[in-house]
Amino acid sequence: MTAQKGELRQGYTTGSCATAAARAALHLLLDGQMPERVSITLPDGGSAEFSPEAGRRDAAGASCCVRKDAGDDPDVTNGLLVCCRVALLDDEPEGHIEFCRGEGVGMVTLPGLGIDVGGPAINPVPRSMIREALGGLLDRYGLRCGVQVTVSVPGGEEVARKTLNARVGVKGGISIIGTSGRVIPYSEEAYLESIARTIRVARHSGSTHLVACAGARSEKLLRRMYPDLPETAFIHYGNRVGSTLDMIQHDGGFRNLTVGVMLAKATKLAQGELDLSSRTVGLNPQFIEHLVRKTGYAEDVALEAKALELVRSLVDIVPFSSSEPLYRALAESCRRVCRNRFPSGGLEFVLMTMQDGCILCDEHGCRDV
């Protein structure tokens, strides 16, 4: 997909690639030749063209591949071949599509994804796209039968280890995904949908207690506190803690919530900032100085805190402990902000540093853990 100068180039989802590969494979099966270009209709009504490759045809079916182009998005699936093998099912009715899992495509092992457990991780929108693309071609040839579609992605199992698939119960490969058919570089919508997906899987898996944290590093600390919780109960918000809390509250299926935040990001959250990205809000020395003064520390401590260039160095001035009024006040402020987004249910806030442990605050107060 081309872009104007200075714009980020869009790409296409694995769902679009699978649709194009399936259409090219069916064309090869019915016509005997692989098309040089294949056009598909996207969910928004637009169209996209692809160049299929690696076409093969035998007595039982045909296969083609389309190489994934994610545009300027840092997508781990970029460059992978998305392949489809199609075979006619003469005993099945018109419109019947049997989706099968090939190499590198994951298997769904948990509920909550809108796909039957045990089935291939081909999401509902790509399934609909493939069904439409093949139906039109069958009509053109006057065929009234079903089609078996086997989707494979060579190298997909290895790439899947770099994704959150295992966390949402997709094992053994990547998912064939996409709601618009397009990859928008650094898409906020796609990022938030990935968080929503982990929340849905947690609920469908029976979790009533969620632990929300920025990522793997903070999760490692929190797992020590909750060793009996399943992996699906740990939700990564990245920097979007506000949106994540909103989704958890809207879901309504959770009785207890623990929110863990590292010290530097906690100074942002305590000010009411709900997007903790450094691009959105930076270090505020005045806020830290104000909090130090408010909690009764000496003038020299306040001035040292104001001069900080890195928040994590605050522990060199005030030892990290729940006995210190500074950290209790910071954690309690963060908990109040979170409570505004999660008004019902039990709520814990955990203030963390990598070196000095954790401070947990709930309705009973704060303590070291």
Swiss-Prot record:
Its EC number is 2.1.1.195. The keyword Transferase applies. Pfam families: CbiD. It catalyses: Co-precorrin-5B + S-adenosyl-L-methionine = Co-precorrin-6A + S-adenosyl-L-homocysteine. It comes from the Bacteria. GO terms for biological process: anaerobic cobalamin biosynthetic process; methylation. Pathway: Cofactor biosynthesis; adenosylcobalamin biosynthesis; cob(II)yrinate a,c-diamide from sirohydrochlorin (anaerobic route): step 6/10. One of its GO terms (molecular function) is cobalt-precorrin-5B C1-methyltransferase activity. This is Cobalt-precorrin-5B C(1)-methyltransferase.
